[in-house]
């Protein structure tokens, strides 16, 4: 199930999300969007994955409790957002709406990368599958939000939020 979960997630990204963004944004803006998404993957992905792996390896020796990584993820996400906003300013794309959406995407994605750790710890492959299903469905619904708002980051933000909401209800990872 865990292979199917990530396969579904990647299929939605590669065959629905990215092609739709490519078609609607145009070559230049799509290239900029991919670079911005690379920043999200590198910065927020590293932050969230570091917390995820740290929790996995420290589980037996340090006995961390749920919520222990919340502050780290928030601070890490804010630092990622600061770097991302500097980049937007540098390439002269910083507007109030892009600042809000990109900062939110960077912060939420850091948390999302961490969110599946409890499913791994408890070997709950069904919940792990539904976590990635929630993100995938969120990305697809996010394309509708993008069509209405004309803000491409809303497509991704919707998917990330769907994943976080599922993790918040299906696990205790963010609760003390």
How should each PLM-predicted stretch be described?
Residues 1-49:
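Signature of the first transmembrane helix
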Residues 18, 45, 84-88, 139-143, ...:
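Structural signal for membrane-spanning alpha-helices in multi-pass inner-membrane proteins
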């Amino acid at each position: 199930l865990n292979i199917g979960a990530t396969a579904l997630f990647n299929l939605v990204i590669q065959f629905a999300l990215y092609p739709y963004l490519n078609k609607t944004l145009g070559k230049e803006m799509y290239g900029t969007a991919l670079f911005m998404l690379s920043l999200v993957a590198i910065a927020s992905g590293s932050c969230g994955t570091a917390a995820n792996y740290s929790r996995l390896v420290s589980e037996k020796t340090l006995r961390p409790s749920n919520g222990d990584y919340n502050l780290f993820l928030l601070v890490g996400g804010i630092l990622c957002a600061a770097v991302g906003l500097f980049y937007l300013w540098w390439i002269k794309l910083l507007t109030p709406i892009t600042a809000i959406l990109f900062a939110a995407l960077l912060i939420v994605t850091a948390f999302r990368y961490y969110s599946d750790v409890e499913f791994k710890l408890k070997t709950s492959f069904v919940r792990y599958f539904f976590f990635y299903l929630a993100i995938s469905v969120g990305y697809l619904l996010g394309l509708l939000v993008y069509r209405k708002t004309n803000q491409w980051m809303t497509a991704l933000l919707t998917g990330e939020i769907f994943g976080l909401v599922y993790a918040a209800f299906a696990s205790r990872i963010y609760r003390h």
